[in-house]
Amino acid sequence: NLLNYLEKWFMARHLTNTPASNRLDELFISATKTQLKAYDEKKLIAILQKEMSQNERICEALDSITLYEDNSALVRYILIYLEQSQRTAENQVDFWAINNKGRPIWSVEHIYPQNPKTNEWSNDCKDGLHALGNLTLTAYNSNLSNRSFDKKAKVKDENGNDIGLKSGNVKINDYLQDKDDWGFDDIQNRSKQLKEVFLKNYLFDDTVNFDDTVN
């Protein structure tokens, strides 16, 4: 229970930057002192909860069109969480694996690329470049790169295997299956879809009042 709470707490903290970095040492010391005589999980959570952002701010952060630009490492964590949540136990993949050069095998891919050929993409896509809905995971970043949407969707490897965005290998790409092109509306709609999946497990229970526990 505590570990699950701490995972949510740090996720929310990184999304909203609340509490601020200069508050963390004091906060953690205060929380630790409450546990010196006896372990009290509820009291520990209460202290952390009082400093945490409201759910509205967490939602606002996920809606940001600069989400990746603001914290690319956090976005990678969110995408991996989303992908793993869509898989059965038999289909789990180690998305944290590294290659023999010490680099991550799976990386964040911009569906609308960071350096697009402008004649191959809708002009309004650039407004959602770093939004959640324009981001996915791939183990073939160099194969996708700055290609058009159609080519990124259907690209194959040297052995003829499907590795594109519509290959079905990445579950969070299911939204793309019936898409022939990609625009800002698609980015917004996919952002909403992914956010809803994420928040099922990452929203805090605002109905819980810990004040009596702390005082």
Q: Where are the regions that the model predicts?
A:
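Flexible coil/loop and intrinsically disordered segments
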Residues: 1-215
